[in-house]
Amino acid sequence: MSFFSPVNQARWARFRHNRRGYWSLWLFLILSLCSLGAELLANDRPLLVQYRGQLYVPVLKNYTEQTFGGAFATAADYQDPWLQQQLATHGWALWPPVRFGATTINFASTVPFPSPPSASNWLGTDANGGDVLARILYGTRISVLFGLLLTLFSSVLGVLAGAIQGYYGGKIDLWGQRFIEVWSGMPTLFLIILLSSVVQPGFWWLLAITVLFGWMTLVGVVRAEFLRTRNYDYVRAAQALGVSDRQIILRHMLPNAMVATLTFLPFILCSSITTLTSLDFLGFGLPLGSPSLGELLLQGKNNLQAPWLGIAAFLSVAVLLTLLIFIGEAVRDAFDPSKAV
């Protein structure tokens, strides 16, 4: 920690003192890394294959059936019993813990879908025959990435707008506040429903729409900090020396405003994940068939006779959001100098 300034060292010590938030951060990082490497944990392709003395990496490269002694030049189906027998006879295959991908259907199941947890499907299957655990892994990755990107883009826009309003004040601040009041009153959900009837919803499309209407969270915080500090002596001195407004805002005033801003980021991330989950649950989110926690919740509601669907999806969302709330509380304590270590 020697590369941290004394102030940051004290903040890190206060963050670690909040044990609940500290361990929540580590658990969230572990879950995020597992979801980012979902292909290595849940896949319908082997990680590594040794066939007749040759090594193959199906998880990274596509191979045809002819590669493994088949008659056709089509893509190898590693769920095919014939191909599995070929690999077992003439070599070996290293499989991930879950032998199903995000869209793989368990055709070998003898139980109607959705099927309960079993040795092959640890958390059961959904109404379409997909493995619930695999879909949770891939759905968590989409939710975390969506939340991080939405938090990043909306925070940048919000900080920029708040900084300009707070620094210049006057008519710029007045018209900026009136615009935000009007813009924040837009019925976002109805606009998404309307646009969904015209454009096929997708990851980037949803991200753009939610950023367009979700960047106002930090404006008030940053604006208040800039209004408070713009008359400080060091700002006046910089202006008297001819320092540009851009340099004053970015180098001298923004670091002070970021102290209050950073405490909001975990809660914004939590809200971003909830937004995507809610849209998927209502049917206005990701395209049909995409791995999504909200879509699993919807399946749980529509299949009350299969409680494992709703329970697995609910626990996944609840754990993810709870960890982020605990992290947010720890970050808030870390930036509060009145908190004793």
PLM region descriptions:
Residues M1-S155, V159, A163-I164, G289, ...:
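Gly/Trp-centered helix-boundary motif
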